[in-house]
Design a protein with these regions (language model features):
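Domain-scale recognition of soluble eukaryotic interaction modules
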Residues: 23-119
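Short glycine-rich, polar/acidic loop-and-turn segments at beta strand-coil junctions
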Residues: 13-17, 30-32
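N-terminal onset of structured domains
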Residues: 1-10, 17-19
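Short, well-ordered beta-strand segments enriched in hydrophobic/aromatic residues
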Residues: 11-13, 78
Length: 119
C-alpha cells in the first residue's frame, strides 16, 4: 500500500556536530499526513533515536541509532515507513486514528497531499 507513491516530498536532514555518534534529524518541509510524521514534519522512526532515547518505551536498543547507519540506510527506513506506517507509537495521533479506522479516508487524504506535491 503505497498511498504516497508518485509524490515529491521535500525534507531537510540536519547533522549534529558529533555525527555519526548521534543521529541526524529529518523533517519534511512539504505537507505530510502520516502516523509517523509529527504535524511539524519531524520524522519519528527508531533508527533516528539515540541509543539511550526511548520516548515511547517500546524500542529495542538494536532498533535505534548506531554510527554504522548511513544516509542511505536512513532514507531506506523512511521510504519503508512511508509505505508501512507503525500505528502503535504514532507521532501524529489524528493520522494514526484515520489509518486504523478509516483507511479509505486516509488514502484520500494522502492522495490530496500527493497531488499538491506535484503541482
Amino acid at each position: 500500500m503505497r498511498y504516497s507513491e508518485g509524490g515529491f516530498f521535500n525534507a531537510i536532514m540536519s547533522f549534529p556536530q558529533d555525527y555519526p555518534n548521534n543521529p541526524p534529524t529529518v523533517r519534511f518541509t512539504t505537507d505530510m499526513w502520516h502516523p509517523n510524521v509529527y504535524p511539524d514534519g519531524r520524522v519519528c522512526i527508531s533508527i533516528l533515536h539515540t541509543p539511550g532515547d526511548d520516548p515511547n518505551g517500546y524500542e529495542k536498543a538494536s532498533e535505534r541509532w548506531s554510527p554504522v547507519h548511513t544516509v542511505e540506510t536512513i532514507m531506506i527506513s523512511i521510504i519503508s515507513m512511508l509505505s508501512s506506517p507503525n500505528d502503535e507509537s504514532p507521532a501524529n495521533i489524528d493520522a494514526a486514528k484515520e489509518w486504523r479506522e478509516d483507511r479509505d479516508g486516509f488514502k484520500k487524504h494522502v492522495k490530496k497531499i500527493v497531488r499538491k506535491s506535484i503541482d
